[in-house]
């Protein structure tokens, strides 16, 4: 059986495309810019991201996926089509078999919307896979074994936490707190603490450069430019990593609580496996400094980040059909 032609990690923040034999061939922001007057799409991906917060009145840059689900069907369909064509190149005549991952908490209606949009974008066949399963496969875990593995996948819009055994999720939860919420928490903090208005991109920059959710041995600082809410004029201030820890405390503790609640519901044998094997973090949000230490401190379980956290889900999505094929062969 030929494996999946394409695996798509349809993320709120980024879209990654995996092609069998080639690996991850595309990673772009899930942003679309279109002209409000003509309804024509002006840019997709990185080009559109650069327009966020900087567009004239008639051009709007939007994220068609919110918290892991489709918020704008037509735009999502066009975006998927664009990325499939870009990944395969113009020479591809055969419609691809596409597997797409969705957060574990989505409804059947939301799954169907993803499936329909992918078919409409030109897929020959579509397989839907839950994010924690894809993340586990992509991080190199053999999910077919009768052994408990815990995955915490922190994306842009959702965090998926699951204990996986024998190819499926035994206990899972999906919370709408993730990387985007880290950015929003920083925006709110800057407004409240410093009377400074900053945009999403600046907040993301602060998070990447000095963001932490656990005390650093050596605190760091960064210069931040924004608009003073009192005078209305541009202003530059110095922000420390300790302030980001304060800003991110509420969001990160909600993720820790979700991990805790999944562990509480896990059957004892599988919980013992997790205690033995540790917790694996995947997704772009897992790159936030201090997250490993915070989860480890609060659960008492060894916590580690996967080797390629950003691409785990895309790789696992692409390899999922091969996993299913292997399972089918075993049954016959």
Q: Which stretches of residues belong to each language-model region?
A:
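Nucleotide/phosphate-binding catalytic cleft detector across ATP-hydrolyzing
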Residues: 1-154, 162-280, 286-332
């Amino acid at each position: 059986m030929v494996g999946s032609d394409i695996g798509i990690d349809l993320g709120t923040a980024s879209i990654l495309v995996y092609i069998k034999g080639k690996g991850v061939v595309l990673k772009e922001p899930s942003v679309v810019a279109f002209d409000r007057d003509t309804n024509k799409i002006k840019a997709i991906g990185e080009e559109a991201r650069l327009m966020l917060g900087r567009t004239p009145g008639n051009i709007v840059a939007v994220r068609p996926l919110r918290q892991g689900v489709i918020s704008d069907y037509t735009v999502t369909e066009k975006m998927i089509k664009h990325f499939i064509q870009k990944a395969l190149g113009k020479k591809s005549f055969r419609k691809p078999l596409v597997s797409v991952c969705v957060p574990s908490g989505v409804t059947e209606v939301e799954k169907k919307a993803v499936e329909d949009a992918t078919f409409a974008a030109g897929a020959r066949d579509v397989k839907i896979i839950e994010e924690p399963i894809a993340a586990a496969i992509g991080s190199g875990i053999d999910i077919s074994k009768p052994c408990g593995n815990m995955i915490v996948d922190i994306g842009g819009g959702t965090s998926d936490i699951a204990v996986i055994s024998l190819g499926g999720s035994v206990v899972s939860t999906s919370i709408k707190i993730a990387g985007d919420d880290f950015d929003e928490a920083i925006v709110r903090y800057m407004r409240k603490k410093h009377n400074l208005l900053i945009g999403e991109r600046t907040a993301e920059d602060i998070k990447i450069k000095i963001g932490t959710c656990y005390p650093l041995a050596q605190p760091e600082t960064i210069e931040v430019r924004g608009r003073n809410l009192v005078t209305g004029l541009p202003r530059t201030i110095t922000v420390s990593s300790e302030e980001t820890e304060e800003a991110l405390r509420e969001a990160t503790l909600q993720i820790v609580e979700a991990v805790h609640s999944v562990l509480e519901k896990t059957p004892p044998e599988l919980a013992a496996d997790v205690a033995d094997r540790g917790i694996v973090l995947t997704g772009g949000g897992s790159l936030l400094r201090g997250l490993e230490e915070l989860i480890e401190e609060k659960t008492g379980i060894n916590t580690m980040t996967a080797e390629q956290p950003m691409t785990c889900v895309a790789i696992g999505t692409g390899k999922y059909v091969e996993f299913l094929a292997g399972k089918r062969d075993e049954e016959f």
